[in-house]
Amino acid sequence: MDTTGLRERAEAWRKADPDPETQAELANVLAKSDWADLADRFAQDLEFGTAGLRGVLGAGPNRMNRAVVRRTTAGLARYLKATVPDVTTRGVVVGRDARRLSKELAEDTAAVFIAEGIPAHVFPEPVPTPVTAFAVLHLNAAAAVMVTASHNPPEYNGYKVYWGNGAQIVPPQDVGIADAIAKVEPANEVPLLTPAQGRAKGLWRDLPEDVGHAYLRAILDLRLYRKGSDTLSLVYTAMHGVGGAWAALALKEAGFPRVTPVAEQQQPDGRFPTVRFPNPEEPGAMDLSIATAERVKADVVLANDPDADRLAVMARDASGKLRLLTGNEVGVLLGHYVLTQGTKRARPHVVTTIVSSTQLGEIARGLDAAYDEVLTGFKWIANRALERTAKEGTQFVFGYEEALGYTVGTATRDKDGVGAALVVADMASWCQARGTTVLGYLEEIQRRFGLHVGAQRNVTLPGAAGAQTIRAIMQAFRASPPANIGGTPVTAVRDYEKGEGGLPPSNVVAFVLEGGGRVTLRPSGTEPKIKYYFEHKETPAPGEPLPQARQRAEAKLAALIDAFLVLARDRGQPA
């Protein structure tokens, strides 16, 4: 290791760092001559992609910090001025969550934009990510930045970019912005204006509460049943994030007086003190919600993640036990509900991803709706909806991805956990009026369209050796795809690296199985993992109790997973 060169780079970066806190942090690392830590901090520049930036807070170019955000914003601002002629008129929205350093990073973002002559429409308080996405369209802004790391652990933060169409950026915008960032001067040389200077010039514009009110009106308009319920008991958790006040107001306005918040998690707290990971999918994250629900005998539990763009749902089964629904089950419920109970449209359009359940497609075909599968990430859902509306006149009504992301209608062009919570409550009250439950409604759908069960397995492979192993796994399955998995014939192989189905090339391989099942594998885009997605379809026998059919389906799914992992091991790859 060239420690002399590493020290020189670190000293130069520290001198250009505008933040005394990270200056001191890096000085301490240098004083200890912790070369491994320094090598990691300076291994690369934190990569800017379609998801923007996300990383651990700390000093150095491979961390999230004020220096990185100032340079990133300068590059984004200059790219906008080069590609969006009216950006200095329309401006850019700046929002933030309640994580550590989010306020400072958002203020730096706005300060750089206004120094570049671009008006900054700034949320003065933390807001849900979907509110920032909504504001782009509501204000006709040229773009938006949301400072958030969503459901990552507390040591993370991030920087999410939306374009003027209200959707997250897609290629080639990410490459163009990254190229512009690479040309930016050191952070301490990036021009800034203070909020007072910006307000005096009319460039720093604090957003009024009217924008939030408009968002609430828009999501309240998503309801289909619209009658609320005095008797439906709901529990809601904000998971220490920013959704609490927004969800409470929306549910109250929608006619749901019996909403019990999880008190320990209702207020924003970037430390996330009651959970190991602030992600409703993680084991233990829902424990306080379950305890609250049992105490008040709740019918349904609604859980947002910290930036309120995702939603987890729990509901009671026939025995009265609370069950956590999968993202696919919630997606199927909402998709069917919107297509059957919503305003009848000439060409309704629903969209999901290539790693989500295929059941939404079966429902769409059965109900004569347009349907698409796109790559993972809500940016692809939003952009496909826009494309088909422009080319074919379809009307987008619903989109989802299995990782607890949903959007109903076109109020926002990103996943919206608050809006989805409101529509789930609306659906639950409709079910109650029909004499059934959320899970009873799911059984109705499964009897008509089949019982789909799914699971995901992640294999963590850290470091350079792990990255090489992941590449080898993908290459091996491409070079020699299995003829069957656990005795079930593979009827088709879909290699998305070749632009399968007209999609942009992506490092994903799927094996379609006889009977409607599927196994899909892809490397994670943000973590050192390879992800395996499994789906099995079972057709219940006439009159067969659904729990019995589900038990059989789960057993077959488990056998499919075991067979695939054995296949991976037999080929010499870890699983």
Predicted regions and their residues:
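Phosphate-binding and adjacent anionic-ligand microenvironments
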Residues: 294, 298-300, 321-323, 341-522, ...
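Short acidic, glycine/serine/threonine-rich loops at helix termini
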Residues: 103-108, 133-137, 155-161, 182, ...
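Gly/Ser/Thr-enriched, mixed-charge loops and adjacent short helices
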Residues: 13, 17, 21, 37-46, ...
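N-terminal small/polar loop signature for handling phosphorylated ligands or for N-terminal nucleophile
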Residues: 93-156, 250-313
